[in-house]
C-alpha cells in the first residue's frame, strides 16, 4: 500500500540521534516526522531538501534565554528569535520574571509593587510568542514571592508552565528599599523584591508535590560573599577583566550547589534540581555528591564558559573562567556530569553597540552580551572537531536532554517519527573567521568577532518549514519567512511515559573528580591570591 505524498523529504544527509548516526531520509507530514527510511523507499514529496552529505540534527532546544530582560518583550523577540533561528535553535526556554512578559508600559527599573501574579502577565507573554517569534518557546517563571510560590499549581494547570527559576543572586535583598543601590542591578533586570530561603523552600515543596515534569532551576552564585571579594579587588587596584572572575571564585558557585542540593533533598518528595551555568571543577564534585545522596539533579553549562576566557574581554554572571576550568568543563560534559547546554542569551543594554558597551576597566563595563550565535560553532569547533565530545553527545546535551528535563520529550528533541519536524543541518567543515556579517542579534556585535570557528549551522527547519539558511550567495545564516513560532504549554504526566533524562551519569568518583586540583581545598589559585588582601 502506497503512503500519502509527503510534505517534505530531507535526503542525502547523515541523521544524528543520541544513540547513533544513520544514512537515511526523513519524511515530514503535517509538521511532524512521518518516517525515517532508506531514500529509495521513501514516498514522493511535495518538496525535497538536499542535505549535501552534511549532518542533520534535531533542532536545538535551548533551555535558557532572556529576551525582554532589558527592553520590551515583543521588541526583543522580533529580533532575537530571528537570531536564534539562525543559530539552529527551534525551541527556546524563555526565563522571565513577571515584570518582563510584555505588559505595558515597560519599566526599565522595577520596584516591589511591580511584582504581581503571573496570572496577570501570562496572557501578554503568550501573545508575544505566538505573534512575533521565529522559534517555538516555553516559559520558565522566575519566582520572587511566597504568593507566586503558592500559585504554582494554578500556573501548571492554566499556563502550562512546569519549570521555575530561583535567581539566588537576589537572596538577601528582600528587606531592601527600592532606592537601595545594592538592589539596582536586579531591579534593572526586572526583579523587584529578591528572595529568601523561605520562598525557596515553598517553591521546592510545591514542585515536589506536583510531580513530573515539575523542576526547580537555580542560578548558583553567592553574591553575598562576592561582595567581599569585590571590595578587596577594588582596594588592590584591580581593573582588568580577570578581576570579574576573581570577584566570584569557584567555591561561591559550588557552595550554592551544596546548600540547595541539601535543601532539595530535605524537601518531602525530593524535588528535582536544575543547576544553571555550572562552570567549575568544584561544582562538578558537588553535583556528583548530590547524585550519590539520591538527588535528581541536572547540570547545565553554556557556550561562553566552554570557550571564552576572561581575557577575551567581558563580564557576565557567572563569570568567564580560566583555562583549567574550561578543560574540566569539557571533561564533565563528555563524562555525563553536565547534562545540558543552554545559551543564556541576553542583549544587555539598549541602545547597544560594542563601542558603547566596552570599557577596559571592568567595574565600569556594562554586564552582558549576546550569546545564542555561539551555540553550535563552539560545540562543533571546540568540542566535536577537537574530539572532546562526539556528535551524538552534542545531540544529547543540546536536543534530547533539554527536551526531557523541560517536559517536551515526545514533541521536541529528536527526529524519531511522531516528533515535531525540527531540524538543523550543519557543515562540520565550514571554517569561518567571524565578522559582523555573521551576527544576527540586534546588538550587531559579539565576542566571537575576529575568532575562527570550524563548524556551522547552514539550515534550520521548524515543523517542516525552513526558518533560516546560509544561501550560496550569503555571507552567513539569514532568517527565512514570516514568524511562525508557537507557545508550548506543558502538562503533568507520569514519568514512565517518557525516557527520563534522569540517567545523569552515576559514574564512580574517580581520581579525576575526587579532589581539587588546587593548592588549598575549596579555593582555586585565583581565589587564593585574594584571601589575604585587606581593605585599605
Residue spans for each PLM region:
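N-terminal metal-binding scaffold of metallo-dependent hydrolase/deaminase domains
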Residues: 1-44
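Divalent metal-coordination and catalytic microenvironments
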Residues: 13, 31, 53, 64, ...
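Metal-associated gating/positioning segment near the N- to mid-region
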Residues: 51-129
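Active-site mouth loops of central-metabolism enzymes
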Residues: 63-75, 136-147, 189, 246-247
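C-terminal cap of metal-dependent C-N hydrolases
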Residues: 353-361, 417-487
Amino acid at each position: 500500500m502506497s503512503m500519502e505524498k509527503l510534505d517534505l523529504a530531507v535526503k542525502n544527509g547523515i541523521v544524528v540521534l543520541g544513540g547513533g548516526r544513520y544514512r537515511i531520509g526523513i519524511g515530514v507530514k503535517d509538521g511532524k516526522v512521518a518516517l525515517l527510511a532508506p531514500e529509495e523507499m521513501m514516498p514522493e514529496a511535495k518538496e525535497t531538501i538536499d542535505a549535501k552529505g552534511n549532518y542533520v540534527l534535531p533542532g536545538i532546544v535551548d533551555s535558557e534565554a532572556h529576551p525582554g530582560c532589558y527592553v520590551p518583550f515583543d521588541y526583543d523577540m522580533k529580533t532575537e528569535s530571528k537570531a536564534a533561528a539562525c543559530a539552529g535553535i527551534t525551541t527556546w526556554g524563555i526565563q522571565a520574571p513577571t515584570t518582563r512578559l510584555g505588559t505595558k508600559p515597560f519599566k526599565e527599573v522595577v520596584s516591589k509593587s511591580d511584582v504581581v501574579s503571573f496570572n496577570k502577565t501570562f496572557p501578554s507573554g503568550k501573545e508575544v510568542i505566538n505573534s512575533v517569534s521565529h522559534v517555538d518557546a516555553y516559559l520558565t517563571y522566575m519566582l520572587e514571592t511566597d504568593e507566586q510560590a503558592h500559585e504554582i499549581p494554578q500556573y501548571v494547570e492554566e499556563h502550562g508552565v512546569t519549570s521555575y527559576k530561583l535567581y539566588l543572586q537576589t537572596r538577601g535583598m528582600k528587606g531592601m528599599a527600592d532606592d537601595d543601590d545594592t538592589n539596582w542591578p536586579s531591579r534593572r533586570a526586572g526583579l523587584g523584591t529578591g528572595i529568601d530561603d523561605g520562598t525557596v523552600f515553598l517553591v521546592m515543596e510545591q514542585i515536589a508535590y506536583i510531580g513530573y515534569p515539575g523542576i526547580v532551576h537555580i542560578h548558583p552564585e553567592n553574591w553575598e560573599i562576592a561582595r567581599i571579594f569585590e571590595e578587596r579587588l577594588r582596594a588592590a587596584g584591580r581593573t582588568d577583566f580577570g578581576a570579574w572572575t576573581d570577584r566570584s571564585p569557584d567555591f561561591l558557585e559550588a557552595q550554592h550547589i551544596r546548600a540547595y542540593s541539601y535543601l532539595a533533598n530535605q524537601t518531602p518528595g525530593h524535588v528535582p534540581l536544575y543547576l544553571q551555568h555550572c562552570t567549575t571543577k568544584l561544582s562538578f564534585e558537588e553535583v556528583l555528591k548530590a547524585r550519590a545522596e539520591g538527588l535528581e539533579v541536572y547540570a547545565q553549562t553554556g557556550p561562553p564558559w566552554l570557550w571564552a576566557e576572561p581575557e577575551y574581554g567581558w563580564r557576565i554572571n557567572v563569570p568567564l573562567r580560566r583555562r583549567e576550568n574550561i578543560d574540566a568543563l569539557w571533561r564533565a560534559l563528555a563524562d555525563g556530569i553536565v547534562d545540558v547546554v543552554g545559551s543564556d542569551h541576553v542583549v544587555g543594554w539598549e541602545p547597544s553597540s560594542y563601542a558603547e558597551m566596552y570599557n577596559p576597566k571592568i567595574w565600569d563595563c556594562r554586564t552582558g552580551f549576546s550569546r545564542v550565535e555561539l551555540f553550535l560553532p563552539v560545540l562543533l569547533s571546540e568540542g566535536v572537531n577537537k574530539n572532546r565530545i562526539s556528535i551524538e553527545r552534542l545531540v544529547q546535551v543540546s536536543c534530547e536532554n533539554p527536551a526531557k528535563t523541560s517536559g517536551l520529550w515526545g514533541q521536541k528533541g529528536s527526529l524519531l517519527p511522531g516528533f515535531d519536524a525540527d531540524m538543523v543541518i550543519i557543515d562540520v567543515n565550514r571554517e569561518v573567521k567571524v565578522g559582523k556579517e555573521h551576527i544576527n542579534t540586534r546588538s550587531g556585535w559579539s565576542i566571537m568577532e575576529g575568532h575562527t570557528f570550524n563548524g556551522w549551522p547552514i539550515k534550520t527547519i521548524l515543523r517542516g518549514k525552513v526558518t533560516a539558511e546560509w544561501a550560496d550567495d550569503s555571507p552567513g545564516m539569514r532568517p527565512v519567512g514570516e514568524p511562525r513560532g508557537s507557545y508550548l504549554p506543558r502538562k503533568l504526566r507520569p514519568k514512565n511515559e517518557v525516557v527520563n533524562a534522569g540517567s545523569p551519569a552515576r559514574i564512580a568518583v574517580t581520581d579525576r573528580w575526587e579532589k581539587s586540583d588546587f593548592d588549598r581545598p575549596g579555593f582555586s589559585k585565583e581565589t587564593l591570591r585574594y584571601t589575604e588582601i585587606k581593605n585599605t
